């Protein structure tokens, strides 16, 4: 379910949990496609037989997990009056647990700050990628974006 707010009121959400995404399964196909796109073909990700033998199965790339943030966050916050938004960067990223192929992940998002910047509003979000059935998250990232209103 999406949280709704007007562009002028987005700062009222600071300190609040924005929402939790649906679960998404990490498939070997997704891992292989990420390996192709990035050139990262390390065996722990793409050599299923060796990974099964040596580490209990293949794991997703940390950066694949991180790259899911825009997809998992889509629809969590609907800011009325926004004409465009851009990714601005990250302050902190930590990979705290590996995601095994076949597991499901979701994102929990909290708005940490909303500050005027370059004619827009810079949003700082804490994005926690959770693994179904695991206590420790896969990734915790503090992301920055800038939204512009009409």
Map each language-model feature to its residues:
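HotDog/MaoC-like acyl-thioester-processing domains
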Residues: 1-13, 99-150
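Hot-dog-fold acyl-thioester-processing enzymes
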Residues: 2-87
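Short alpha-helix capping/helix-loop boundary micro-motifs
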Residues: 90-95
């Amino acid at each position: 379910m999406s949280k709704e707010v007007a562009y002028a009121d987005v700062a009222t959400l600071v300190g609040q949990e924005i929402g939790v995404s649906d679960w998404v399964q990490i498939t070997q196909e997704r891992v292989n496609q990420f390996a192709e796109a990035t050139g990262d073909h390390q065996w722990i990700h793409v050599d299923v037989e060796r990974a099964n033998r040596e580490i209990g199965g293949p794991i997703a790339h940390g950066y694949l997990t991180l790259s899911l943030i825009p997809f998992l966050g889509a629809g969590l916050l609907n800011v009325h009056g926004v004409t465009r938004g851009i990714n601005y960067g990250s302050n902190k990223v930590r990979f705290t647990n590996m995601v095994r192929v076949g597991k499901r992940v979701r994102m929990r998002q909290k708005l940490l700050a909303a500050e005027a910047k370059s004619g827009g509003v810079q949003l700082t979000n804490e994005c926690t990628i959770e693994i179904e059935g695991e206590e420790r998250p896969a990734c915790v990232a503090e992301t920055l974006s800038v939204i512009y209103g009409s």
